[in-house]
């Protein structure tokens, strides 16, 4: 996930330089920040234990969802042409699916851990 997001950022950086000035310093800057914050959240999550990862994965999901909307606005205002929008939105959608899968796996593992801790066998041991 991190490697793909990094390649999206490098692609975005080239497009960012060519945005109209009116959007470069508003929407463009916000999109840039969202990408950096997503990379940061995923990097942090990758170094944490399973129990600690989920909040950071969820932050990354929110950032990526917001990023999709901001890119759509740039495209709808004709500040980003079709080719550039497609080049960015496809991989970003894929990142969103990957993060959703990661979040689902973490949820399942955390639920299994919680169920084991609350199982009747554990209660009998006490």
Placement of each model-derived feature along the sequence:
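Amphipathic alpha-helical assembly/interaction segments
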Residues: 1-126
């Amino acid at each position: 996930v991190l490697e793909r997001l990094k390649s999206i950022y490098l692609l975005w950086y080239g497009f960012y330089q060519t945005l109209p000035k009116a959007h470069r310093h508003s929407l463009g800057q916000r999109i840039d920040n969202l990408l950096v914050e997503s990379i940061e959240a995923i990097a942090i999550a990758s170094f944490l234990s399973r129990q600690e990862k989920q909040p950071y994965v969820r932050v990354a999901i929110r950032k990526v969802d917001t990023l999709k909307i901001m890119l759509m606005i740039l495209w709808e205002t004709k500040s980003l042409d079709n080719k550039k929008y497609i080049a960015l939105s496809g991989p970003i959608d894929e990142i969103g699916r990957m993060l959703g899968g990661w979040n689902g796996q973490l949820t399942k593992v955390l639920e299994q851990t919680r169920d084991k801790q609350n199982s009747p066998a554990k209660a009998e041991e006490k």
